[in-house]
Design a protein with these regions (language model features):
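Positively charged, solvent-exposed patches that mediate nucleic-acid binding
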Residues: 1-105
Length: 105
């Protein structure tokens, strides 16, 4: 299933206001059912310079791509990583799978 990226500030704002939230030690997820699968990533400046922030975004996109087939419905999702020493695709995948099971997505 193809997913589309959330790009507009209005889309992010709508999700932040009306979406449900789920948390893990390394990740916060805000989601809401929608007609098509959309995903956005919000990485703050506390994560370092742009090189580190862009790397985290690449890792999150890859982790989401790997687990999106396990989702039952289509959602609009924002992924927000927490500040940590270690970021890896496997860690993000594990955390996303846990959220999908817990929230019955």
């Amino acid at each position: 299933m193809k997913y589309y990226r959330l790009k507009k500030q209005a889309d992010f704002s709508r999700l932040f206001q009306k979406g449900k939230r789920a948390f893990t030690p390394a990740l916060s997820v805000i989601y809401r059912p929608s007609e098509k699968m959309t995903m956005g990533i919000s990485v703050g400046k506390k994560h370092g310079k742009s090189v580190q922030r862009n790397r985290i975004k690449r890792l999150l996109r890859e982790a989401f791509r790997a687990v999106q087939g396990e989702m039952n419905n289509t959602y609009s999702i924002v992924l927000i990583p927490k500040v940590s020493e270690e970021y890896s695709v496997k860690n993000f995948e594990r955390q996303l799978r846990w959220i999908i099971q817990k929230e019955k997505m």
